[in-house]
Amino acid sequence: NIPTFRDKDGYWKNFPPFKDKNLEAQDLASPWAFRNELPHAWAFYEWRRRNAKENQPHEGYSITNKWLEPQDSFIHTTNTDGLHLRSGCPEDRVMEVHGSMWRLQCLNTCTHQFWEELSVTLCNLNTDTMKASNYPICKNCKGIARPHILMFGDGEYIGHPEQEANFRRFVEKPIDLAILVGSSGAVPTNDYIALNLQER
């Protein structure tokens, strides 16, 4: 299973070294962590990438794809695991609003570019200490790369202009139905969109 990190007990169970240092998921999923706790920050994401790679899209993805295929439809997801695209949903019909762990960008934002990186393993991971080493490198400046994910307290995420443009074009049309699946008040991005559509 792919953990949500909203259940603190489950999070601590997966990452005992982080419990010892009182590092919560929100601490590690931040630009601050990549500058101050780099071995732990990259360990957190490397573990998540390996976990996501081991998991396959469940039947719900196939059902959704078959249902949406004949419709003029779009998926707006806060998930960063890439499972919608892996399940066969067309790229031009998905908006990964919080980014994807399968893309990287420069930690120092030397350029407003991101690149796909599907390699697993991406860096060395010591699961006993939950420290990573041999980090991925920015293709441009050769500095450290980071996940192309909108993190907590993140003003440096560069977004995905193509996905954003596709979604803008879609929402300009009349929309008859919006379905929220697995939405949480803790991450209300999709809730806001649904409410906005409801008020049209």
Where are these regions (language model features)?
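Conserved catalytic core of sirtuin-type NAD+-dependent deacylases
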Residues: N1-R200
